[in-house]
Structure formats: structure tokens, C-alpha cells
Amino acid sequence: MFKPLTLIAASILAVTSFNAAANCDPGEIVIKFSHVTNTDKHPKGIAASLLEKRVNEEMNGKACMQVFPNSTLYDDDKVLEALLNGDVQLAAPSLSKFEKFTKKYRIFDLPFLFEDVDAVDRFQSSAKGEELKNAMTRRGVKGLEFWHNGMKQISANKPILVPADAKGLKFRVQASDVLVAQFEQIGANPQKMSFAETYGGLQTKVIDGQENTWSNIYGQKYFEVQDGTTETNHGILDYLVVTSSKWWDGLPADVRDQFAKILNEVTIERNAESNKVEELNKQYIIEAGGVVRTLTPEQRQQWVDALKPVWQKFEKDIGADLIEAALAANQK
């Protein structure tokens, strides 16, 4: 049965009606969690707020979590250094942000590899996906849980329906060699730019377009300074909740086990809701007057064919076995 948008929104917002950063008591282990999104409309922000609530209720006296959203403490380009320095204990950067720690996560940037978020979930839950969490252990970074955002769409200051429409345009990308290659493959000019700078870049026409999820496009108001957004679903934008191996190994066993259990339960609950949150943000954009375009099957196939060579370029870094496992995850 159809639910009014306001009722769906209310059910999602119900989990985010929490207090600001907690006041920790003496003797409690302080867990600072820095991230870059809002707290009430973004999958990561909602999950972080729920995690904070549960830790502070269920681990009261043992541990205390403080969440710092909207890049108020660190942006994703600096948070990993802060993590290794012990200035924060938890972060959840996008998987594209781990380039200097491992090349394995490049698999998540390959265009049109995953059919949908459910396929991503199956891959991350597989043995190969579990192995990826430990890909940075030697560098002092421990992966804990994968968090979903959603599939990426393309927006620009002109209509984009086929790859040729993007030729010559400047697109903001994360600091990922795969994403650079993706836009170069279709004749566009990729520009590495931080999340926080992207709206200004679009507004001042330093860049012409960008790729992102519905929640980021709505939450950062990119749709206000673009001609429209094309629903390409060409890639996944996900996060990895990480901590420093040193901090994690130094926790008392009971604290570590209880925290890991809570984090896993929050992950399962919120990942199951990610598609609903993304669809909600898409509708927010439409209701606000934003233009959303869809592709015909023939147009989509043009994108798939144009971007397939990117896979071959990075297969050696990623591993053919991982790519095969990802493709297998598309089979339900």
C-alpha cells in the first residue's frame, strides 16, 4: 500500500531525534565519531546518530560516544590522519577515500559493476567482502562495517542522457583514479574536489557537474545549481566504518565485544533502510522543483558500453577474483 511521503519521512526521522554530542562522565571511554553529512536525511548521518544513541544508553558507565556531523571536526580528506593520531576513534569515509591505504577498494568505483544496492550488500557479506575489511590492517586502519549510501546519479548544467552529452564538461570527482578514468573515458574533464567545496564549485561554474547519490544531491542542494539530474545508477557510493587498529586492540575485551555487537546491529538495521532513504531524497528533489531524467534501455546501454574499458584498466590493482565475485553477487 502507498504511504504518503510525510509518513515515510516521519518513520525515518524518528530514529534521529537525539541530543547533540553527549557529555561524557569521568572514567568512560570516549569514542569520537567524525563524519561529513547531515544527521536526519542522510543514510550515514542517520546510522551514526542511532549508533550514538545506543552506545550511550547501553554502555553507560563504560563508554561514551560523541558524533560530530557536517565536517564540523574533520572532512573525509583529513579524518584518517586524525584517526591514526588518536584525535578521533571512529570515521566512515566513502570507499574512494582509502586510495593511499589500499587499491582493493577501487572495485567499488568501477562503473556499472553492481546492478543495485542489494547486489553490493551480497558482495560485502560474502567471504571476499569480509576479507576487504582487513585490507588496511598493516597500515593501522581496521575496517569494522560497510554502510550503504546508494547508487550514484549524474547531474550537470545541461541535460545528460548519453555519454556524448558529457564531452568537454568538468565534473567533480572524489580523489579516486577510477573515477578520474571514468569521466576521461567519455571525454569529460574530471576535477578532484572535496565534498564541502562542491556546491560552491557548481554555483560559480568552476565545475559543470558531479556524480552522487540522491541523499547527497538533496542534502547538499546540488540540484538547485544544476539543470537536472539523470538517474544513471552507474556506481555505488558506500562507506566503511573504520577505527585505528591500535585503539581497537587496546580496548577491554568486554567493551570491544559489546560495541562491535551494537555496531553490527545498527549496520543491519540501517542498511536495510538505505533504499527507502534514497527514494525519499529523490522525491524531495522533485517536490522542490528539481528536474530528474531517466534513461531508456538503449541510452543506458550506451553508458555501459562506453565505460566498460575502465574495468580492464584497473583489473590488476583490484584482482580478477574480486571482480568475478562482484559480478556473481548480481545473481540473486
UniProtKB/Swiss-Prot annotation:
Any one GO CC term of this protein is: outer membrane-bounded periplasmic space
Q: Where in the cell is it found?
A: Periplasm
Protein's recorded name? C4-dicarboxylate-binding periplasmic protein DctP
> How does it associate, per the subunit comment?
The complex comprises the extracytoplasmic solute receptor protein DctP, and the two transmembrane proteins DctQ and DctM.
Name its GO BP terms in alphabetical order: C4-dicarboxylate transport; transmembrane transport
Task: Please report which protein family the annotation says this sequence is part of.
Answer: Belongs to the bacterial solute-binding protein 7 family.
User: What exactly does this protein do?
Assistant: Part of the tripartite ATP-independent periplasmic (TRAP) transport system DctPQM involved in C4-dicarboxylates uptake.
- As given in the record, the signal peptide range reads 1-22
For the keyword Signal, the answer is: yes
